[in-house]
Amino acid sequence: MNDRITLAQAHCQPREKKEHKLGQARLAELLTQVPGWELSNNGHALTRTFQFDNYYRTLAFVNALAFIAHCEDHHPDMNVHYGRAVVCFSTHKIGGISEIDFICAAKTSALYEQGI
């Protein structure tokens, strides 16, 4: 990825080969660019919980995120609750985390910061 483009500005490219799975050093580097996200599932996923005032705002966020996921062709696992949504990205075909998970995490954080 071009260093002049932020993760939130980048677009997903298919990552289906095992060599696209990120190593520990690159994971640690990219984690600094997505505050609030953490490794989960024994380091095989990237997860963040988003808080909302009510169920309507939670679902509005989830629906907006669904549109972003569709456009990027990379879809998170989500748990939706009253006042919160747990979003989890991983690249299933490689059995871990790739750069596209960080791109989508950054886009998700940007959506949340917009107050959707």
Curated annotation (Swiss-Prot):
Signal peptide: none
Stored Gene3D superfamilies: Transcriptional coactivator/pterin dehydratase
Keywords in alphabetical order: Lyase
Gene Ontology terms, MF aspect: 4-alpha-hydroxytetrahydrobiopterin dehydratase activity
Record InterPro entries: PCD_sf, Pterin_deHydtase
One Pfam family in the UniProt entry: Pterin_4a
Family in the record: Belongs to the pterin-4-alpha-carbinolamine dehydratase family.
Name of the protein: Putative pterin-4-alpha-carbinolamine dehydratase
Protein's organism: Xylella fastidiosa (strain Temecula1 / ATCC 700964)
